[in-house]
């Protein structure tokens, strides 16, 4: 656990699963993380993705979305993304994945906590029903190459280089 807090009437328990890049666990730590992520008793999952290597993180996101859709994606290190001359279209990413996407800066710890709290509120306020499996189902991850290709395609569609941004200047 990295923290328990309260936001209004909502009790929030955050569990950190660092270094988890796939639900196909290869260590005991990854198995524990996977089981917590896929636990149908959990009210939702916030996946914190490193914006500087979005494609790798999208593999885990896509695997999780095969198991449940009560997910919020938090793209972290957006300041580092900008330093590299890149941008991430979080609105487009949200549309593609069908879940909320928020972003945070690596240098602003208070803002990170606030954005994570906002992500939890978005989970609790979402209308409609959530779909969840009854736990981890390895059959949903039979084709890792397909998931990796999908992650690559999504990343290519939402990561924008500075020189690819739309030029809205008026030419005289």
What role is predicted for each listed range?
Residues 3-9, 31-102:
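Conserved C-terminal guanine-recognition region of P-loop GTPase G domains, centered on the G4
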Residues 11-28, 51:
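Switch II (G3) loop of P-loop NTPases
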Residues 13, 25, 29-32, 56-60, ...:
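Helical mechanochemical/support elements of P-loop NTPase systems and associated helical scaffolds
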Residues 16, 33, 172:
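Conserved RecA-like P-loop NTPase ATPase core
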Residues 18, 135-139:
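Short hinge/gating elements
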Residues 79-132:
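Canonical P-loop GTPase G-domain recognition
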Residues 118-125, 140-160:
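Extended, hydrophilic extramembrane loops/domains of integral membrane proteins
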Residues 156-170:
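Short, membrane-interfacial amphipathic segments enriched in basic
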């Amino acid at each position: 656990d990295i923290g328990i807090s309260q936001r209004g009437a909502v009790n929030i328990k955050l569990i950190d699963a660092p270094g988890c890049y796939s639900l196909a666990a290869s260590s005991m730590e990854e198995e524990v993380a996977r089981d917590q992520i896929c636990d149908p008793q959990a009210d939702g999952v916030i996946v914190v993705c490193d914006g500087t290597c979005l494609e790798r993180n999208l593999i885990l996101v896509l695997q999780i979305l095969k198991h449940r859709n009560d997910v919020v994606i938090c793209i972290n290190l957006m300041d580092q993304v900008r330093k590299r001359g890149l941008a991430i279209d979080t609105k487009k990413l949200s549309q593609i994945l069908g879940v909320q996407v928020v972003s945070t800066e690596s240098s602003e710890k208070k803002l990170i906590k606030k954005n994570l709290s906002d992500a939890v509120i978005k989970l609790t306020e979402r209308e409609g029903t959530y779909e969840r499996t009854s736990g981890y189902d390895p059959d949903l991850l039979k084709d890792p190459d397909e998931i990796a290709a999908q992650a690559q395609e999504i990343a290519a569609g939402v990561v924008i280089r500075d020189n690819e941004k739309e030029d809205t200047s008026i030419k005289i």
